């Protein structure tokens, strides 16, 4: 499946035309297809993957596959997007690229991002507000600066001496 086809699957929940209309490619189905393709092309342009839009996703390196995953999610035009470990397995350059895109998602698409991430540098750089959990209990909540200086967070993540 190509990058474009993969991103287009993110639009499936937005399709309203019936089976017959789609099969005959008439009227409403044709208009929907054009509109959906335009939305997907906008997302592809935003994530700077135009040059690989016809490439099978299976041939892409890991970092680009993660970008395609983000593109597919954005194609559905969510109001809230939950990203669970979006930087997992990425090298430094890939993390920088993904961070840049995540920072711009709200401005470009009006989508709020809820991020679950263990790379605290990424969390502090990307977040307006941070909530820190330790074994299922909330131990910190505030701006990155407030959380960075929260003693409970410091103890949980750096350890505390029990002498």
Residues of each region from the PLM?
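Glycine-rich phosphate-binding loops of nucleotide-dependent enzymes
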Residues: 1-163
């Amino acid at each position: 499946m190509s990058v474009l086809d993969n991103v287009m699957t993110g639009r499936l929940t937005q399709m309203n035309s019936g089976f017959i209309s789609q099969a005959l490619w008439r009227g409403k189905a044709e208009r929907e297809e054009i509109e959906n393709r335009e939305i997907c092309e906008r997302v592809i342009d935003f994530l700077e993957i135009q040059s690989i839009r016809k490439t099978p996703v299976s041939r892409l390196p890991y970092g680009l596959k993660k970008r395609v995953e983000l593109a597919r999610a954005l194609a559905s035009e969510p109001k809230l997007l939950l990203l669970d470990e979006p930087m997992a397995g990425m090298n430094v350059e890939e993390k920088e690229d993904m961070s840049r895109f995540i920072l711009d998602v709200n401005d470009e698409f009006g989508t709020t991002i809820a991020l679950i991430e263990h790379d605290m540098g990424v969390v502090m750089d990307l977040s307006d507000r941070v909530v820190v959990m330790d074994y299922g209990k909330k131990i910190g909540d505030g701006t990155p600066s407030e959380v960075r200086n929260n003693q409970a967070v410091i103890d949980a993540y750096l350890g505390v001496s029990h002498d």
